[in-house]
């Protein structure tokens, strides 16, 4: 009888937790970044940068990133995108974001917000680290990480700007079809 009570108690606690928003939001925090080079899955890190994650979701919902080129791709460093003008000088119509620096290191596959010299100037541009770039730690906002498809990021044409730039086909939330 004691075992039955223990099992009942265990399942009455675990089952509701597994249906809680925390578990649901894990699915919501994965985005599909469809590039001209292939599909990349990214995990948004709202535990590190909630305002930046909110902005990325907002812009993705508006299809802001669709067909935007990678305008700055430095071999052994990073691939930058998110500027609708393709020059590195543009952004969205939304106000710039305050920095959300964290101790999270910039490693291969880390995604950070690009900005000007002013720490609170991030808007829509972001970069994906092609290699570790720990010299950026605590100077740029980490808001996501590549969890699948890094080979497609590696295949992005290099240059500032590249002669034939690769681009974002679309950015969207992951759904069950993406599993």
Please identify what each model-predicted range represents.
Residues 6-12, 19-179:
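Cyclophilin-like peptidyl-prolyl cis-trans isomerases
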Residues 1-4:
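Positively charged n-region of N-terminal signal peptides that target proteins for export
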């Amino acid at each position: 009888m004691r075992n039955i009570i223990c099992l009942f108690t265990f399942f009455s606690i675990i089952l509701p937790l597994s249906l809680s928003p925390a578990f649901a939001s894990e699915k919501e925090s994965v985005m599909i970044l469809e590039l001209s080079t292939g599909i990349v899955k990214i995990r948004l890190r709202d535990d590190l940068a909630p305002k930046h994650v909110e902005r990325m979701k907002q812009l993705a919902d508006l299809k802001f990133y669709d067909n935007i080129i990678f305008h700055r791709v430095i071999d052994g460093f990073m691939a930058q995108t998110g500027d609708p003008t393709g020059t590195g000088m543009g952004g969205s119509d939304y106000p710039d974001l305050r920095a959300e620096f964290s101790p999270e290191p910039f490693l291969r596959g880390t995604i950070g917000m690009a900005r000007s010299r002013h720490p609170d100037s991030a808007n829509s541009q972001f970069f994906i680290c092609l290699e570790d770039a720990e010299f950026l730690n605590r100077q740029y906002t980490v808001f996501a990480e590549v969890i699948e498809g890094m080979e497609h990021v590696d295949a992005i044409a290099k240059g500032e700007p590249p002669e034939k730039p690769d681009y974002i086909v679309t950015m969207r939330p992951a759904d069950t079809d993406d599993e």
